[in-house]
């Protein structure tokens, strides 16, 4: 059995890791780190896991408690994973970090957007960006995987094939993305109080969202040239899910059948990417609770536009599910093990 530890187990992404790994036939969870709930039974923190997860939360000693594990999941806020990652890697063990600390390859860009000094530059140089469908070989060989953010996952999977095949303009990409409230995390926040987010939709962080450099980094790699995008996220009154509507210009006047063929070339063998055909478009309910990313598109001949829509569950494919998928790949397992949950409908 694979012995796994989870740092930050009581945040939403950490709790989703606990749920998925508890159901994984090849994994035993060795510890559930939580400073906020130290000594408290995990089922008291998350009643949904009563009689399923029987361990207690504990504040982990970074010096001693890593000895008995094979792989570490860090589900801590940005800036807090770096010391744990350094210590774990020094022991020759493997790490999947769900924070932003190792996603952005240029530390100066990371420091400018996150206002945190990067103190694990050696480890940053060894990190592999964990977009499972795009970098499978690199992930298999990695000691450290930087798990992608939720918005970047939904956007990069949608655009990667089109940019690689040079069928859309790189100059005028506009992304309108909508996220459920769990994307804001579990900490108390005035903006996510029920009475303020229920029956309410609002845009936020226009042009300043911290996922922008991560998105631009990955799209630039796909396009083979530096890209700048216009990204506007919105908070919508649902628990989980991300719907990204992406406006691009169809520079080669590619027809819908050809676009379907492009997506099929990249994703036909990818279990967790589902291409919707015949003009059907994704919806968040159809992926809720699952590791799927649904992608659909529409060609608008009147404007020469190619509009792409993607949907993911922000806590699964956008966080914990992709982390488990990456673990499977790193450890030589079939990548879908522990991730075969069907979406919840309605």
UniProtKB/Swiss-Prot annotation:
Pathway per its UniProt entry is: Amino-acid biosynthesis; L-arginine biosynthesis; N(2)-acetyl-L-ornithine from L-glutamate: step 3/4
Q: What EC number(s) does the entry state?
A: 1.2.1.38
Active-site positions, per UniProt? 150
Query: Where is the protein found, in the record's own terms?
Result: Cytoplasm
**GO terms for molecular function, please?**
N-acetyl-gamma-glutamyl-phosphate reductase activity; NAD binding; NADP+ binding
GO term, biological process aspect, one: L-arginine biosynthetic process
Q: Does the keyword NADP apply?
A: yes
Pfam annotation, one family? Semialdhyde_dhC_1
Answer whether the UniProt record assigns the keyword Phosphoprotein to this protein: no
- UniProt keyword terms in alphabetical order: Amino-acid biosynthesis, Arginine biosynthesis, Cytoplasm, NADP, Oxidoreductase
GO CC annotations, alphabetized: cytoplasm
Catalysed reaction(s) here are: N-acetyl-L-glutamate 5-semialdehyde + phosphate + NADP(+) = N-acetyl-L-glutamyl 5-phosphate + NADPH + H(+)
Q: Which HAMAP family does this UniProt record tie to the protein?
A: ArgC_type1
Protein family according to the UniProt entry: Belongs to the NAGSA dehydrogenase family. Type 1 subfamily.
Question: In UniProt terms, what function does this protein have?
Answer: Catalyzes the NADPH-dependent reduction of N-acetyl-5-glutamyl phosphate to yield N-acetyl-L-glutamate 5-semialdehyde.
Its name, as the record gives it, is N-acetyl-gamma-glutamyl-phosphate reductase
Lineage, highest ranks first: Bacteria, Bacillati, Bacillota, Clostridia, Peptostreptococcales
